[in-house]
Amino acid sequence: MSVNRLVKHDATPASIHKLIVAAERNLVDARATNISVENRFDAAYKAIMQCAMAALWAKGYRTLTSEPGHHQLVIQILPKTMDVENDVVIVLDALRKQRNLNDYSGDTVSDATLTECIVQSGQLIKRVRKAGLGS
């Protein structure tokens, strides 16, 4: 773990649970068809980040959000926090890059990318629930 970009964090099970419940709400929002694809993508991506943060908190750390690259770090550390396979990390990192293009360049999000983001967020939520995080 990149110690200079992580700090110790004593998260309570209740705070981890709250973050996972928020991820579940965001996944519900991502599936709502009455909002734009981009907003649905943002909600699904946010669910991914909330799950990744919950996993990191459960290991006793959090990122320095004042430092650039904290989203990338939380995704890249998933193999250590949740035993996520490297091929999944590659997909999640591609979704992170798409989120940046959408947020900072106004790029649109394809239906296929939205679907992938929803699938990945759902799978991460299942992983954190199966791991018993926040219980």
Ranges and model annotations:
Residues 1-135:
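Terminal alpha-helical segments
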